[in-house]
Amino acid sequence: LTDVDGNSYIDLTAGFGPNVLGNRPQVVEQAISDQIKKGWHFGIPGPGQAELAEILKEASPVTEQVMFCNSGSEATMFAFRAARAYTGKQVVALFDGSYHGIHDYALTKADLKSDRSKPTSKVMGAGVPDVVPQDLMLMLPYRDKNAFDLIRQYKDSLAMVVVEPVQSSN
């Protein structure tokens, strides 16, 4: 990467995820160029998405359905919703310091005034109802064995536990 002053840097974050193939790999540029010639916004799923969905299902025998999202925020929002619908439970557990998007349910973080072994949550901005961090999210301490105790304690109300194994963008 090169900034406006001509300084060069190594992108050790891979663009926080989406650049796992590097910055501007020729094969990706060519694929984008080829697709643009066919169109770039269709509004409804097309043959390419159906083909990719089948490839993903074949690669993972337990996968029954595939849903494509246009952002990580949208993906986690639907994952939270699906987990709540499937389990009938309401609470989602997140690890302190992780980033899972900009929707109401992901805009929570540990309250720094709370006990690290059992962090309480607060929102990261205006407009998120108080009920979200207080009743719908469980903040877990990252790299702390007390997280397991909290998961066991709240297991009857947990719809899911979201794990970001390598924290990178928060």
Question: Model segments located where?
Answer:
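Conserved PLP phosphate-binding loop immediately N-terminal to the Schiff-base lysine helix
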Residues: 164-170
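Glycine-rich loop-to-alpha-helix module at the N-terminal edge of alpha/beta enzyme cores
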Residues: 8-89
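Active-site flanking residues adjacent to catalytic metal/cofactor-binding acidic residues
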Residues: 10, 95, 163
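PLP-dependent aspartate aminotransferase-fold enzymes
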Residues: 54-160
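Active-site pre-Tyr helix/loop in NAD(P)-dependent dehydrogenases
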Residues: 15, 98, 166
